[in-house]
Amino acid sequence: MSTGGDRLPEAFLRPGSSSFVEFLREVAPQSHPEHARPAGAGDVVHATTIVALSFAGGIVMAGDRRATMGSFIAHREIEKVFPGDEYSAIGIAGTAGIGVELVRLFQLELEHFEKIEGAMLSLEGKANRLTTLLRGNLGLALQGLAAVPLFGGYDLDRAAGRIFSYDVTGGRYEERNHHSIGSGGMFARGSLKKLWRPGLGDRDAIAVALAALVDAADDDSATGGPDALRGIFPVVATVTAEGYRRIAEGELAGLVAEIDAARAQAREGDTR
C-alpha cells in the first residue's frame, strides 16, 4: 500500500531484513522463482559442464558454452559462469532458465546485504545465502527442473581461494583443490585429478581448466569444447585478492592452441 502521493510503498520505507529474498517474498511473491510455473522437463534448455580449481592466488572457474534440449544443441554460446560479487564466482548446471534466475537473485542478495549492512558478507556467508536460495527452489527441483551451482571465491579472511559444491536440496560441501559439475563433470574431474598440482600459477590453472573441458567434450555430447572456427571459447574467470576477472578470448585462444599442439605432438610420439 502506498503512503500517499508519489511516495514508495510502505514496505520500501520501513526497516527490514538484510535479505533481498525475504523482501521479494513480501513485496512481489509472484516474482520469486519458487512460484514459477513448471514446464515439461523435455521442453527446457539444460546447461552442462562447469569446472573450478584453486591455484596459488585464488580460484579459476570455467564453463563450456553449449546448452542442450533433449538430444538437440539448443545454444552454442550460452554463458554459465558469472560474478557473484567482486570476490566470488558462480557457475550453473542443469535447467538453464532456473539457473540464470538463481544467479541474478543471488547477485541481488549480496548487493542488498552490502547496502543494508554497510559491509560485505564473508565468503562463508555468501555460500550459506546460496544454500537458502537453493532450498527455495526445491519444489521445482523435485519436478525435474533443477539447477545446481558451483560457487567459489577469494576468502579475504583466510587469504586463499575456496570452492563450494551443492546438491539440489541446498546441501553445501566445501571442495579441496578442484571440482566439476554437470553432464561432463565426471570426465572433467578425471582430467583435473591428473593435471592439478599444488602451487599452480594463474596461467597454468587456466590451462588446466581448459584441458578439463576439452576432455569432457571428448566424451560427453552435451559439453561443447573450444570452437576456434566459430570463435567460441569457454567462459573462464579468476577470483583473486584483486577481485573477479574474466579472461579475454584472445588469451584463451592462445592457450587452446597450445593444448591442441601438445596433444597432437603426443599422438605423433605414440608408437603403439
Curated annotation (Swiss-Prot):
Annotated EC: 3.4.25.1
Keyword Hydrolase: yes
Cell location: Cytoplasm
Superkingdom, natural source: Bacteria
Propeptide: 1-47
Any one GO MF annotation of this record: threonine-type endopeptidase activity
Keyword annotations from UniProtKB, A to Z: Autocatalytic cleavage, Cytoplasm, Hydrolase, Protease, Proteasome, Threonine protease, Zymogen
Active site per the UniProt annotation: T48 (nucleophile)
Main location per the UniProt record: cytoplasm
GO biological process, one term: proteasomal protein catabolic process
Gene Ontology CC terms: cytoplasm; proteasome core complex, beta-subunit complex
Involved pathway(s): Protein degradation; proteasomal Pup-dependent pathway
Catalytic activity: Cleavage of peptide bonds with very broad specificity
Activation/inhibition comment: The formation of the proteasomal ATPase ARC-20S proteasome complex, likely via the docking of the C-termini of ARC into the intersubunit pockets in the alpha-rings, may trigger opening of the gate for substrate entry. Interconversion between the open-gate and close-gate conformations leads to a dynamic regulation of the 20S proteasome proteolysis activity.
Pfam families tied to this protein: Proteasome (PF00227)
Assembly and oligomerization: The 20S proteasome core is composed of 14 alpha and 14 beta subunits that assemble into four stacked heptameric rings, resulting in a barrel-shaped structure. The two inner rings, each composed of seven catalytic beta subunits, are sandwiched by two outer rings, each composed of seven alpha subunits. The catalytic chamber with the active sites is on the inside of the barrel. Has a gated structure, the ends of the cylinder being occluded by the N-termini of the alpha-subunits. Is capped by the proteasome-associated ATPase, ARC.
Family classification: Belongs to the peptidase T1B family.
General function of this protein: Component of the proteasome core, a large protease complex with broad specificity involved in protein degradation.
Protein name per UniProt: Proteasome subunit beta
Source organism of this protein record: Beutenbergia cavernae (strain ATCC BAA-8 / DSM 12333 / CCUG 43141 / JCM 11478 / NBRC 16432 / NCIMB 13614 / HKI 0122)
